[in-house]
């Protein structure tokens, strides 16, 4: 049995975690096994790498160091959580995955796409999301939401130019592969965003059981 791999992407403050939990609840109501997870993180070791990546530090982190740590955490996460859950037939709902690496380390940091693609192939093999939900939001709104949550992590402290590049990379990737991506307007009221998720449910269930 093979499950379904769904990733949720978007900039800071876009509501990915809230909507991931909502989608999980709706799927579980229909008797579907759901594996909730996130990146970077998802296993104890990967969560320790997450701490390194997010904690502000007096020592600047080189962009390639950041990239390699992301994929180190991802390798552990895939082996320990994602592949086993898919093998059980579960729906994996993952808050960020490799699209975030293209957006943040590629778009934001300016690292070559080919470098990211090489690591993607090495670490993931043929594993790719079945569906990616991109929660799109104007940068200023996302940053205001992130600031309202309290202390900012290392990424949230980046400037507007960084996040504009992140947003545009997400939208470009979605436009290049519309069969895999669904872009949702995260600036709408939460109830409207979640109504959009409800409309996706029949297709998700058909793909899972089809």
Swiss-Prot record:
GO terms for MF: ATP binding; dTMP kinase activity
E.C. no: 2.7.4.9
GO biological process, one term: dUDP biosynthetic process
Keyword Endoplasmic reticulum: no
UniProt cross-references to CDD domains, sorted A to Z: TMPK (cd01672)
Keywords linked to the UniProt accession: ATP-binding, Kinase, Nucleotide biosynthesis, Nucleotide-binding, Transferase
Signal peptide: none
Coiled coil start-end: none
Pfam family, one: Thymidylate_kin
Catalytic activity from the UniProt record: dTMP + ATP = dTDP + ADP
Annotated ATP binding sites: 10-17
Tagged with keyword Transferase: yes
GO terms for cellular component: cytosol
HAMAP family: Thymidylate_kinase (MF_00165)
Family in the record: Belongs to the thymidylate kinase family.
PANTHER family cross-referenced by the UniProt entry: THYMIDYLATE KINASE (PTHR10344), UMP-CMP KINASE 2, MITOCHONDRIAL (PTHR10344:SF4)
Function: Phosphorylation of dTMP to form dTDP in both de novo and salvage pathways of dTTP synthesis.
Protein name: Thymidylate kinase
Organism of derivation: Pseudomonas paraeruginosa (strain DSM 24068 / PA7) (Pseudomonas aeruginosa (strain PA7))
Lineage per the UniProt record: Bacteria, Pseudomonadati, Pseudomonadota, Gammaproteobacteria, Pseudomonadales
């Amino acid at each position: 049995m093979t499950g379904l791999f769904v990733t949720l992407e978007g900039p800071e403050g876009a509501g990915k975690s809230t909507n991931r939990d909502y989608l999980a609840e709706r799927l579980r109501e229909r008797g579907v096994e759901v594996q909730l997870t996130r990146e970077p993180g998802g296993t104890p070791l990967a969560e320790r790498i997450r701490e390194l990546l997010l904690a502000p530090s007096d020592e600047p982190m080189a962009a390639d160091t950041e990239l390699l740590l992301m994929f180190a955490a991802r390798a552990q996460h895939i082996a320990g959580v994602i592949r086993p859950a898919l093998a059980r037939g579960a729906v994996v709902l993952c808050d960020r995955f490799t699209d975030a690496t293209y957006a943040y380390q590629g778009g934001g940091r300016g690292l070559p796409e080919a470098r990211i693609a090489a690591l993607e192939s090495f670490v993931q093999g043929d594993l790719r999301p079945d569906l990616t939900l991109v929660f799109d939001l104007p940068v200023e709104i996302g940053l205001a939401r992130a600031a309202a949550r309290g202390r900012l992590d290392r990424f949230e402290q980046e400037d507007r130019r960084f996040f504009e590049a992140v947003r545009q990379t997400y939208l470009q990737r979605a436009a290049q592969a519309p069969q895999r991506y669904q872009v949702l307007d995260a600036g709408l009221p939460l109830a409207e965003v979640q109504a959009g998720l409800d409309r996706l449910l029949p297709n998700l269930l058909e793909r899972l059981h089809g």
